[in-house]
Regions:
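Short, conserved phosphate-binding/catalytic loop or strand-edge motifs used
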Residues: 105-110, 270, 293-294, 316-322
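Short, small/polar-rich motifs associated with maturation and membrane association
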Residues: 60-61, 117
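An alpha-helical repeat/solenoid feature that recognizes helix-turn-helix modules
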Residues: 1-5, 22-52, 69-98, 117-181, ...
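Buried hydrophobic core positions in alpha-solenoid tandem helical repeats
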Residues: 17-18, 57, 107, 111, ...
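Helix-turn-helix repeat elements of alpha-solenoid scaffolds
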Residues: 7-12, 183-186, 220, 309-311, ...
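Repeat-mediated protein-protein interaction surfaces in helical alpha-solenoids
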Residues: 13-20, 183-196, 233
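Terminal amphipathic helices with adjacent charged low-complexity linkers/tails
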Residues: 229-235
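Nucleic acid-processing catalytic cores of prokaryotic defense/repair systems
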Residues: 65-67
Length: 503
């Protein structure tokens, strides 16, 4: 294995970070929590199975009446609020008190007054599936909503699933299982039951699993929900669990970008190596099918830590013009293709290698926004997509990186941060720093003052709560992944400052 540079001590923060992995630290999801709040106790149909979920919902409602993100990201607010409204409408009569009534009234007001822009902003995974299902549920409860505003979304759903034979939903591990709730009353319960993961979930989705439990009883699925609630302790559910492959791979990737390859990572690396198959690897060893993004980043991490790799696990995801993250997806992912390109540049030679690299480079070139930055389907901020595109293109297409460096420099805020949604965040600042530190030496040398402001900002804000910016069925924040990006940026900045001082 590659040694850790002797002149770079391993910070205590990194040791603590590695020790905390595989615990599933992730932000709460009002969308999934609301599905669980609808479940009734097995021995009392007038009592909630998990009353703590209602408490969480009432505590987490935003000041504008919405649920979900507090950022101006309309789709997350919409599906989270509709999910909460259905849960509030389904409460037993004994719980229809003043607090629940006020929450429902303000949420209804939000949907009427503040969702005119619902088609703008980042998309969510499965949005065109789950929104029509939520609207159907709201209509069945006669909730007074502006249904005409959302005309057309059902056609999008039908366009996505119309060509898929229904039997495939239950016979293969497609991404549709992760959004099983889109089936509404059309679910085949026994066919679905056969697709339960060994961990008791449907594709590691609490909301899909709770949806199933609303229609039938299943001890294994119920224990999956109960275990998550016990482990979290605040009455909330996340949008995905478990996700340990994703967490380990992204954390080790961020550390490696800062030159950190600690010996303490070896058990985690062995876990990744054992999980990787000829068909790739997914977010977790169980529950979700392999995908190109987790496969590519796992390969990249293993290579960076000295493990032999090949391009074989990426072959199932190759398309005509780019690499697919999942089957059936509508749009390609910039970051997934960037991660694939990183791997293609370091694996042993194989037939068509150069042609495939050029295909991915062309896709990334064509995917630029305004010729100087990128956006991605798996993260709400363009600073993530741009950073990861730059990481891949620096060696193979540096001409595409120069405009991105200029865009990044010009996007910094006065307080030293970067942020896309109204204010800066430590996470987005970390990505901007990581990307800028791959620039030519003369570019970095000319940024002494901006980088010093970025370092000061990160030092002041590193303990702030993680703001969910990652995109699943709702926005989420993988705590340790974000922490690792910030640590990586801080190490890079400290090393750069040390180098300047030595000069």
């Amino acid at each position: 294995m590659l040694p850790r540079p002797a002149d770079v001590p391993l910070p205590a923060a990194i040791k603590g970070l590695l020790a905390s992995l595989q615990q599933g630290a992730i932000s709460a999801a009002a969308y999934d929590t609301a599905f669980t709040a609808r479940l009734r106790a097995a021995d009392d149909p007038n009592a909630l199975a998990y009353p703590q979920t209602l408490g969480f919902l009432l505590r987490s409602q935003n000041a504008d009446g919405s649920f979900g993100t507090a950022l101006p990201i309309p789709k997350d607010k919409l599906v989270s609020t509709l999910s909460a409204l259905v849960a509030l409408a389904d409460l037993p009569q004994s719980l229809q008190d003043g607090a629940a009534h006020r929450a429902r009234a303000t949420a209804l007001r939000f949907v009427y007054e503040d969702t005119g822009n619902w088609q703008t902003g980042p998309d969510l995974a499965g949005f065109e599936l789950v929104l029509p299902a939520l609207l159907d549920e709201a209509r069945a409860r006669e909730l007074p909503l502006p249904y005409e505003r959302f005309m057309g979304i059902s056609a999008q759903r039908d366009a996505k699933i119309g060509h898929i034979p229904p039997r495939l939903i239950y016979n293969v591990a497609t991404p549709l299982l992760h959004s099983l709730e889109y089936l509404g009353n059309r679910i085949d319960l026994e066919a679905a039951r056969a697709q339960l993961s060994p961990n008791g979930s449907f594709a590691n989705s609490p909301s899909a699993t709770a949806y199933f439990l609303l229609r039938t009883r299943d001890e294994q699925a119920n224990e999956y929900i109960a275990m998550l609630l016990r482990n979290r302790g605040d009455g909330s559910l996340p949008t995905v669990a478990p996700f340990e492959i994703f967490e380990i791979a992204w954390v080790l990737y961020n550390l490696a970008r800062a030159g950190q390859r600690p010996a303490e990572a070896q058990p985690l690396l062995r876990y990744l190596a054992q999980a990787l198959t000829d068909d790739g690897v997914g977010v977790s060893r169980e529950g979700l099918r392999p995908d190109a993004d987790d496969t590519a980043l796992t390969l990249s991490v293993l290579h960076r830590y000295g493990y032999p790799i090949s391009a074989g696990p990426l072959r199932p995801f190759e398309g005509v013009s780019f690499f697919f993250t999942f089957p059936l997806e509508r749009d390609a992912s910039v970051s997934a293709n960037a991660h694939v390109l990183e791997v293609l540049q370091v694996v042993p030679p194989f037939p068509r290698q150069h042609l495939i690299q050029q295909k991915v480079i062309k896709y990334l070139r064509d995917a630029r926004v305004d010729g100087d930055h990128w956006v991605d389907k798996w993260h709400g901020s363009p600073f993530y997509a741009t950073a990861h595109a730059v990481f891949a293109l620096t060696a193979s297409a540096p001409d595409l990186c120069r405009p991105a460096f200029t865009w990044l420099k010009n996007s910094q805020r006065e307080d030293g941060s970067w942020g896309w949604f109204g204010k800066g965040t430590p996470e987005e600042t970390a990505y901007a720093v990581q990307a800028l530190m791959t620039a030519p030496a003369e570019t970095i040398a000319a940024m002494t003052e901006p980088l010093a402001r970025a370092a000061a900002y990160l030092n002041e804000t590193e303990a702030e709560p993680v703001i969910p910016l990652w995109v699943g069925k709702t926005l989420y924040g993988p705590t340790q992944v974000v922490r690792s990006a910030v640590l990586s940026a801080q190490i890079l900045l400290a090393r750069s400052e040390h180098a300047r001082s030595a000069d």
